[in-house]
Design a protein with these regions (language model features):
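Conserved small/polar residues in nucleotide/adenosyl-binding loops
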Residues: 112-113
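Short gly/ser-rich loop at a beta-strand->alpha-helix junction or flexible surface loop bordering the NTP-binding
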Residues: 23-44
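Acidic pyrophosphate-coordinating catalytic loop
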Residues: 37, 107-109
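Metal-dependent nucleotidyltransferase catalytic core
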Residues: 1-20, 46-107
């Protein structure tokens, strides 16, 4: 994983821990976790249309909260803007994707998928 991305993740970890309460776990998932991330891809189709793609940072936060939706909104409205400010000029073009769930929800999902 690129050093710059590691720095971004460290900033996100710090912001998550200082802005959400009762955080149990912070999990990186998606293409960066699998090591199959795309730094930058530019594709041209037969009509001459150009598309661009770059992997984003997918983060699952597990915390003890009564309202995971409210915590997730807080992440979008408070943590992501603070991240943008801290990483100005050095961050991914796409904002990080932060999902917040409770341990009960995660455990229920694991029971149903196993």
């Amino acid at each position: 994983m690129p050093k710059r991305t590691q720095e971004e993740l460290a900033v996100l970890q710090e912001l998550i821990l200082s802005n959400l309460t009762n955080v149990r776990m912070i999990i990186l998932y998606g293409s960066y976790a699998r090591g199959k991330y795309v730094i930058w891809d530019e594709t041209y189709d037969e009509r001459g249309v150009t598309t661009y793609y770059q992997s984003d940072l997918d983060i699952l936060v597990i915390c003890d909260t009564r309202d995971a939706n409210k915590a997730e909104r807080h992440a979008r409205e408070v943590i992501v803007p603070k991240y943008d400010t801290r990483m100005e000029g050095k961050r991914h073009p796409a904002p990080p994707n932060i999902i917040v769930e409770t341990p009960v929800t995660i455990n229920s999902c694991l029971l149903y998928t196993s």
